[in-house]
């Protein structure tokens, strides 16, 4: 979409709840505090990052992902040049969007080159706009809320990406 909505929709979103990492009483106590354990992530996915496209790709990720606790620019092929990598590191440090090098053959082999700067609070205005414009995102938030309240991840409620992330990424790279 052109205009005001062009760079608002991330390619992929995710969340983290420490249900398997924390004791039940800690999870309950956390729910009483202002420091919520739920974390939202946003990802902009590209086939490659080169000298020709990195600025546009990075600032698209800034625009699409700054609403979340952490935002990332993800690419399979990232130019391996010291000067180029230093520039990516500078951008990540300055604007807070991290860089992930994706290994589509082995998702677990992917690595964070430069971590995102975590945000304490979410950009609620942008989240509201995303929900108004994107039914899938609105449903995603509803499902996360249900999981948070029930203290159980209902994996069947999430889209096909979680079922076969490698296939989703390969399709996205076409």
Question: Language-model segments: what does each one mean?
Answer:
Residues 1-5, 72:
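A short acidic/basic microdomain associated with nuclease active sites
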Residues 12-23, 37-50:
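Conserved catalytic cores of phosphodiester-cleaving nucleases, focusing on short active-site segments
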Residues 25-31:
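Intrinsically disordered, low-complexity Ser/Thr- and acidic-rich flexible linkers and loops
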Residues 46-47, 58-61:
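Catalytic core segments in nucleotide and nucleic-acid processing enzymes
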């Amino acid at each position: 979409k052109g205009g005001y909505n062009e760079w608002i929709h991330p390619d992929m979103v995710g969340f983290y709840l420490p249900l398997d990492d924390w004791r039940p009483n800690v999870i309950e106590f956390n729910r009483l505090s202002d420091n919520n354990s739920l974390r939202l992530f946003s990802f902009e996915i590209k086939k490659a990052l080169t000298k020709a496209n990195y600025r546009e790709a990075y600032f698209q990720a800034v625009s699409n992902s700054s609403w979340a606790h952490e935002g990332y620019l993800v690419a399979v092929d990232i130019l391996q040049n010291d000067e180029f990598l230093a520039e990516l590191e500078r951008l990540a440090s300055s604007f807070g969007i991290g860089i992930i090098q994706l290994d589509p053959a082995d998702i677990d082999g992917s690595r964070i080159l430069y971590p995102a700067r975590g945000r304490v609070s979410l950009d609620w205005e942008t989240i509201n706009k995303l929900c108004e414009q994107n039914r899938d995102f609105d449903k995603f938030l509803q499902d996360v809320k249900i999981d948070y309240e029930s203290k159980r991840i209902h994996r069947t409620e999430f889209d096909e990406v979680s079922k076969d992330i490698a296939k989703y990424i390969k399709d996205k790279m076409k």
